[in-house]
Amino acid sequence: MTLILFNPCANNSDISAALADVRAYAAASDPVEKDLTRVDVCAEICALGENDRVLLLGGDGTIMRLANALDGAEYAAPIYLWRSGTGNDFLRDLGKNESTEPVLLNPYLVNLPRVEVKGKVYRYINGIGFGLDGMVCEVTDALKAKGVKKINYTAESIKLLLGGFKCPSGRVTVDGVTKSYKKIWLASAMHGKYYGGGMRVAPDQERGSGLLTCCVWHTSGKLATLMHFPKIFTGEHVQYKKSIDVISGKRITVEFDTPTALQIDGETVSGVTTYTAWID
């Protein structure tokens, strides 16, 4: 049996083309389709055997949702990701962003990092963004709620950089070592290299290394930040050592003096002052 789990909110709530493709792909196995926002995902998958399979339609946020639903569960069925998101940073990190073949997820759903935010703990796939990048997600969520379909994340980032975002001060602690900053643009905790639809925030981070990478962009003024910002898509921003600290470790705590939006694999949490991310 093939279980097709789809996220109707993926790809800006337009997965009709991907759903048609996966139906054709799985037609011979008499597939069953279920909306993962309306079922007990863990129960559905745990009921399957090793000769069954799951085809998951969605992007990074959908994988994160699946990882949290299955956290601690034992299941036998292989789970494949069918590319149908907008950012697709997980696939980009694997070098499979343009692949038309489903990607086996099972090896990547183990030993995932956790993040604690506002009293809740989540598993995550790619990274935590806190600061400008979190606020971009908050703003674009509002645009989606208004029915805007075509959203340029880079353009929204630049708008906020130039006017809407006020840098907080804060502290970053990695494996017990704390550093204070007066002006923070972003402070991430990366498990993969990418977030934000192609931002190569942590170019040297290796998924599965047992470490996380904290990238702190600080101190720089608006003009300097604007000049260097495009380099985040190639990873060259880390060469701007005057204003970017890159620190690896197993436990990262970030504290801001002002409530700021945070994003977990593209999913927004508003009004955050602190988070802790760690990997076992």
Residue ranges and their predicted role:
Residues 3-6, 33, 72-185:
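Catalytic core of DAGKc-family lipid kinases
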Residues 15, 65-68, 90-93, 198-199, ...:
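Short glycine-/acidic-enriched loop or helix-start segments at secondary-structure transitions
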Residues 65-66, 89-90, 135, 263-264:
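Phosphate- and divalent-cation-binding pockets in alpha/beta enzyme and binding domains
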Residues 1-57, 64, 68-75:
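ATP/NTP phosphate-donor binding region
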Residues 129, 133, 188-201:
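Glycine-rich phosphate/pyrophosphate-binding beta-alpha loops
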Residues 144-154, 197, 203-224:
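Gly/Ser/Thr-rich active-site loops/lids in small-molecule metabolic enzymes
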Residues 176, 206, 216-280:
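ATP/nucleoside-binding phosphotransfer catalytic cores, i.e., glycine-rich phosphate-binding loops
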